Amino acid sequence: MEEYKDAHFTLRLFKAVLNLPQFKNYSAGIVVQAYLPDAYDFQTELLEFAKARVDGGGAPIKMRLVKGCNLEMETVISSLKGWPNPIRPSKTEVDANYLCLLERGLMPENARVLHLGVASHNLFSIAYAYLLAQKYGTTGYMTFEMLEGMANHLWRAQSMLGNRVILYTPVVKNEHFLNAVSYLVRRMDENTAPDNFLTHSFNLKPDTKEWDFLAKQFEEAYAMKDHLTHVSPRVQNRNLPYTPVAPSDTMQNEPDTDFDVSQNQEWVRRIFAKWKKSGTEEPEIIPLQIGAETVVCKNRYKYLDRCQNDEVCICEMSQADSAQVEKIIEIAETDPAGWRKTTLEERHRIMYEAANRLADMRGDLIGCMCAVTGKTVIEGDVEVSEAVDYARFYTTAMKKFAALDDIEIKPKGTILVISPWNFPCAIPVGGIVAGLAGGNTVILKPATVAAPVAWMFAKAFWDAGVPKEALQVIITNREALKVLTTAPAIKHIILTGGTD
């Protein structure tokens, strides 16, 4: 349970395995990290499980209690993903939670079914656990657990008191030493931190400034232990309506989905239920868009569900012929809706609204990507976040350029965006937003095999205020594609991928 992303799953797996009949009398243990607000609930769940197990004639289990061992990585991951850090915000809170869990774990009714491993090198925490166990008469259910070589005098003193001590010794073969470097660096980082006990432990004696510092640290944690909240800050819920982001001149990235929380896992199951077609429904017919009008063509491309073994048709999309392509180009060139006349501020507002709508349709975009291209949910999710970021970034950046001296922003005319199949959302959105942000009209020709995704996200832009004449989405045959790419009215082409 070292990484937060694995914590809830590991606990469920631990219980599921020990519930198997062959493991009824098997004594097993699991680690709980006190720096997580979830730790209290983890302990509660383990206590309920252990009591039912022992009452049913099964063996007790063990909980190894540590302060936490992945702080830096959790902080980095949370920052990159735009999520709240799952770790308690201060060392005092972490220490307080550790003491809270210690006291609860050493109570007689709890310790007899859920044995406790006290993993710490902090003399004050160790002494507190020792005195609690003496008070409750639960010393026999407790072990002290330490790392070899880090505070040997402490475990020797423990042994002299008759306490059971478990020493952990990292072992690595010479040829694998490189793999141990990250562990070594982490130990060095923790042990030299200003608030870490071991930093102040050398020549530690009562009535010294080091002793007083550590004693005060313990007293503050002890005073806080009964006043903690045990609610995880990871509360993202994709089942709720999206909260719109107002237009801003400061760019802030859209958070990815936190799949570690149960409510978002349920959200994924709902996506699957919605997008997995049985084959009995009539497939959707996606028309050809020619400006503000739509036409259903005889020549259509069929899309099968890439997530199913059976040939289930999801939809069919109309393909443009050469004459229709010429009409589409004419509309983009003449710009009847006047998109090129809009101000940068107007486009900035519309792009932010489009970003909000893209974020709100995240589930359907992911479902469409999974079904049409066979992407995984995680792959599709980060694409949606990137698309939302593009929609906000280009006009935000363009406003900064417009504020510079001797800079004048003019549209080029009509932009053709040709995008690949393997990134069916993020890359085409980036291309069309780059064009629209500059006041250009845009024709999007996505990869044919992934085009339904483009049709879906285009609705976000149209609904946000982009005229359909300013953003047209088409697929074509090769002959018509040549007409599109060689037309003099096309002033710029953004091409990513192959020649499809």
Model-predicted regions and their roles:
Residues 13-20, 42-49, 101-108, 128-135, ...:
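Generic, well-ordered alpha-helical scaffold segments in large soluble proteins
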Residues 1-2, 31-33, 64-66, 115-121, ...:
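Generic beta-strand/beta-sheet core signal
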Residues 1, 27-28, 84-88, 110-115, ...:
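Glycine- and acidic
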Residues 1-253:
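Positively charged, amphipathic and often flexible ligand-engagement surfaces
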Residues 370, 398-500:
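Rossmann-like NAD(P) dinucleotide-binding subdomain of oxidoreductase/dehydrogenase enzymes
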Residues 4-51, 336-412, 423, 427, ...:
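Long, K/E/R/D-enriched contiguous segments that form extended
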Residues 163, 174-330, 334, 341, ...:
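Terminal low-complexity tails and localization/encapsulation signals of metabolic enzymes
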Residues 96-103, 127-130, 156, 182-183, ...:
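Feature representing long, continuous alpha-helical segments
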